[in-house]
């Protein structure tokens, strides 16, 4: 990214302010010795004591003429043969090499804006910058990132680390509950086997001697002292009466259950609390990173994708921490413990089970690789459906007015049909896996049972224990597979989450050199292409022979001193992007924007924006809240009286106190507020901030509101004003006027200077357009006045007719009275 400077070093008399802006005379050092892979950065030093450049209008005009000539030459060169084109490319490469060789002498104003600055008071050290690889984040899709799985796991662990003691105690409780669950099958098997043995013994005695009648021995009549049995003894006695003499085993079962219950509670509570804490911090960092991204990032990414990252992906992370992680550890412990117990009981049967489990695991891995792309595709289609719903609901008025309901319905049905077709194959794969997995599980159980029978385990307690532990192991395998699936979703979601959290904004958000409050604003050979603003602009020199296709601004240079009024006119859309570059929302593709003598790429934009305000009805946003909250938005430290004073200056106070709750009345996007009143809220915000630089868009201001004109006239006093002019009075009061056409400045000067050239674009196009607008407005106003006068005349005639009718009625009534009196 290079440019040819258009600055002339002038004498001291031509420079209005020689003092360095905001930093006294202390030198500033930029250390650019960091190596980033193959990129070797040079060391650049500069001192603010040296004279700094300002723009010479004459040289800017000369450069404009040169650029026009260059464009003509480029057009001629495009008609030449391929050899000439090759020569041009070689010249471009040579020029690029020359410019790259001169980077050591260029001021740090031209430091590549992709670099991230560690701003300190007087020394800037680039060695601490943590660079983000260009391929680590895809600007246009959250579903295609090169974030590695290992890096995602490491980042998740960094968020878990502050809650480490929650997880330590949660895993301790989890281990105890798992041990209890491992002991239960052993106790149950012993109890059931003992009951079966006792019943078989009694049945054997009865069947061998049918003539012997066994009668219980009569209890002697002895008086004994009875005691109330404990709860444990009561439960044990009831169980014993049902299943035989298993008192010892059942006591252990009750003890295990009672021990397990509080640890189950602790496990769930600790995992849930830790999960909420981790996800809360993650969402905070995610939203903070989102707010610090440059505006062009939101231009190139869909709102629905960003909302899905904050809402859906973070919810997946929370579910994995609170549920899936616990399930993974629990099932792993149960699997390992169950296998160890089975090895202790019979190592031969255990080997058979392990062989079935290996087949199940391999099948799962193959299935996961097969179904994972389908899952990602379905997730992407779900996001598209969400976008259609958001757009349709948010723009329902426009859809209704344009009769576009059927079009939106067709789009929705198309996405639904695609989702339905994809879901059918996804469901078919899942159904196959569930049936195949169940077949493997049942085959494992049947194989173990058959092998155990062949090993003469059927007549011992080992067979029942084997079956119970086999069921536990297969259930653990199913739980492991489910938790691994959820963790795979977590990895996919965390790639999108951490790609956004770690993304370094192209336009720095905070920090930098603080400008003076009386700084001027200057553009030096500024080119801007919004389509390429997100990427490196290494190939810009190769694009010069393409007539600046796609450029919004081309070779724009001007300066506005403190207290001056600059007007921007012309049909080009470049005027709006002048505002965006001054606001620091974008960086220029080429060239430099200076605030004072400071490049916006190293400027403290946070401070500068506090001294800057834009009045444009199209950019005025009403937030959900009260009137007072909307006026003071971002300035919570101000008192209510400050709000009232600003509202009075904006001619808004009388309207607000007429509302049901005054300044506490709720407004927002869904409230039907008059556009004039919304504009007054914006003007009240400007009075409250008292900016030193005011950006004014007159193209959307109402012409017939005297209150708006009076409040703006009061606001612009003693301020630097840059206006997109649409009124003749504004042009007459301007210190300088820039006429834009075809994305470049074609004329400049005061109103009187530009008006003297009758054939100029300013006279033939701009003034005629403004006069036509005023004539139309005046004609409309005259027509309205004539209509009002006619209505008034008609009303007067009607009133006269009514008066005549009343007089006639009075005469008739008098005649009737006279006749009546005569008859009497």
Curated annotation (Swiss-Prot):
GO BP annotations, alphabetical order: chemotaxis; transmembrane transport
Residue numbers spanned by region Disordered: 41-101, 772-813
Any one GO cellular component localisation term in the record: membrane
MF GO annotations: ABC-type transporter activity; ATP binding; ATP hydrolysis activity; ATPase-coupled transmembrane transporter activity
PANTHER family, per database record: ATP-BINDING CASSETTE SUB-FAMILY B MEMBER 10, MITOCHONDRIAL, ATP-DEPENDENT PERMEASE MDL1, MITOCHONDRIAL
Transmembrane residue ranges: 164-184, 252-272, 325-345, 347-367, 431-451, 461-481
Gene3D superfamilies: ABC transporter type 1, transmembrane domain, P-loop containing nucleotide triphosphate hydrolases
SUPFAM superfamilies, per database record: ABC transporter transmembrane region, P-loop containing nucleoside triphosphate hydrolases
Name of the protein in its database record: ABC transporter B family member 7
Pfam family, one: ABC_membrane
Biased composition (Low complexity): 63-101
Primary location: membrane
Organism for this UniProt entry: Dictyostelium discoideum
CDD domains: ABC_6TM_TAP_ABCB8_10_like (cd18557)
